[in-house]
Amino acid sequence: MEREFSHINAMGKLRMVDVTSKRITRRSAMARCLVVTSADMGALEPREDEIDPVICARIAGVSAAKRTSELIPLCHTLNLNDVNVELTPHDRGIEVTTTVTATQRTGVEMEALTACAFAALSIFNTLLLADPIALIDELELLKKVGGKSGNWGRLVEDADKKPPTSV
């Protein structure tokens, strides 16, 4: 089956997907990425009279999720119910994991990915002096739950793990 792009109309022109007829349901998505660095989480410890970089990264992620439609063309403006940003040590650096939940007519995959990317950028900015060759890697959607296409992703158990036919 040939895949069709959801944001391209029959005449080949870009369009915002019309979600008017979709049901309002609970939707969630989880994304992750790695900030690959030789520095450890100790490099993120706040110094005296400085803002905590972990808190700053969480705020950056939440703010970015809320503004996804301003940052990514053709994304719908959504009222989000919850945005969670977690930073954990990883053998290659720091893992950023985000979960976004909303009760809407469309999914929150882009919001989860955007939150993850911006939280990682905030950490990257903090690490520039400690590790100027740090990089952001493996930005990926781990799962999405809800909506017409059902549950799918790398972490979805007992579900069709293939993405929907529209991309």
Task: Show the residue positions of the predicted features.
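C-terminal binding/interaction regions
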Residues: 1-76, 81-167
